Regions:
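Alpha/beta-hydrolase fold active-site loops
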Residues: 51-52, 132
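Conserved redox-active cysteine motifs that mediate thiol-disulfide chemistry
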Residues: 48-49, 55-73
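Hydrophobic, well-ordered secondary-structure elements that form the walls
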Residues: 54, 97, 110, 141
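Thiol/disulfide oxidoreductase modules built on the thioredoxin-like
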Residues: 104-106, 113-162
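Structural microenvironment flanking redox-active thiols in thiol-disulfide oxidoreductases
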Residues: 66-104, 115-124
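N-proximal helix/coil linker or "cap" segments that precede and/or mark the start of modular domains
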Residues: 1-35, 40, 45-50, 76-79, ...
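Conserved hydrophobic packing residues within short motifs/helices of P-loop NTPase cores
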Residues: 54, 86-88, 111, 135
């Protein structure tokens, strides 16, 4: 109802549904901007051309930190085969993000989304409600998997490489 849409819960639900609709499998990955460890802007359009593994995480997320081991293994396996890994942190503090990157020894591009968890436009754009959350993007820029992890991620990457 229009009344429900105007209340705070209705507004939040609409935002979430809009994010899910804009980043559904089969659609072009939405354009976004994040910052690398040197403060340089990284955009989706600058990443196109390779298979992309977009890893949404945060330093305070225990399961995200555990997922890094699997991602490191897959990075080693696929880094020279046209697969690019990009971590997108939803930390509010750039210091905590940078410290976590050092602790995790992340060898791929690590970026920070403005706004932290609460106010990140990138999180809202992808309709992310929990992390870790991995989005797989094909060479053509279309989303081919959302919330794919570990063996499922590996299988989907192999499938894309064999096309």
């Amino acid at each position: 109802t229009p009344r429900a849409q105007q209340c705070s819960w209705g507004w939040l639900l609409k935002q979430h549904l809009d994010g899910l609709a804009a980043s559904a499998e089969g659609l072009m990955c939405p354009e976004f901007t994040v910052s690398d460890e040197d403060g340089n802007q990284v955009t989706m359009s600058s990443l196109k051309g390779d298979i992309l593994v977009l890893d949404f995480w945060a330093s305070w997320c225990g399961p995200c930190r555990q997922e890094m081991k699997s991602l490191r293994e897959q990075y080693k396996e696929f880094k020279d085969k046209g697969v690019r890994f990009v971590s997108i942190s939803l930390d509010a503090s750039s210091d905590k993000w940078k410290k976590a990157c050092e602790e995790e020894n992340i060898p791929w591009l690590s970026t920070l989304a403005d706004g932290g968890w609460d106010d990140s436009e990138v999180r809202k754009l992808f309709g992310i409600q929990s992390i870790p959350h991995i989005v797989l993007v094909g060479k053509d820029g279309k989303i081919v998997g959302k919330n794919v992890r570990r063996n499922l991620l590996r299988d989907k990457i192999i499938e894309l490489l064999n096309k």
